């Protein structure tokens, strides 16, 4: 077990973000795999499975990096982690807030907070 002082941040696995060539086509294909469409914008989509696991679909020219998304339960957790990582928090158009940082092997990790009224 890691010492608390060594902990960068923690969260539960929420989603992965992958590149896709054709957003509309890939949304349809993930629906055929049992995913539902949660969010659709011109530049990305979020699909969720029955347990709530998400796949963010990013067109090749997306400003978002491929990444692992970890969810925190409170804004205070997000703020504390962002301070430890020395990263700015960005509020998003869907009401969430997050920051990106480097994870294991240099892969991007997004730490994200969903407010209580998300999706309502």
Residue positions per predicted region:
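Vicinal oxygen chelate
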Residues: 1-9, 12-21, 60-120
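Core segments of cupin and vicinal oxygen chelate
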Residues: 8-11, 17-54
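A short, compositionally biased micro-patch
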Residues: 23, 40, 50, 75, ...
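Short amphipathic alpha-helices in soluble, non-transmembrane regions
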Residues: 31-32, 81-85
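Conserved short beta-strand elements that form part of the metal-binding/catalytic scaffold
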Residues: 35-66, 108-116
């Amino acid at each position: 077990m890691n010492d608390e002082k060594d902990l960068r941040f923690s969260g539960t696995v929420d989603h992965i973000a992958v590149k896709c060539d054709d957003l509309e086509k890939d949304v349809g294909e993930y629906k055929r795999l049992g995913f539902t469409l949660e969010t659709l914008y011109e530049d990305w989509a979020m699909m969720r499975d029955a347990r709530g696991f998400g796949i963010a679909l990013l067109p090749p020219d997306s400003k978002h990096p491929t990444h692992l998304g970890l969810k925190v339960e409170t804004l205070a957790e997000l703020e504390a982690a962002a301070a430890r990582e020395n990263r700015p928090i960005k509020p998003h158009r869907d009401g969430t807030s997050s920051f990106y940082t480097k994870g294991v092997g240099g892969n991007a990790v997004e730490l994200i907070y969903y407010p209580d009224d998300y999706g309502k």
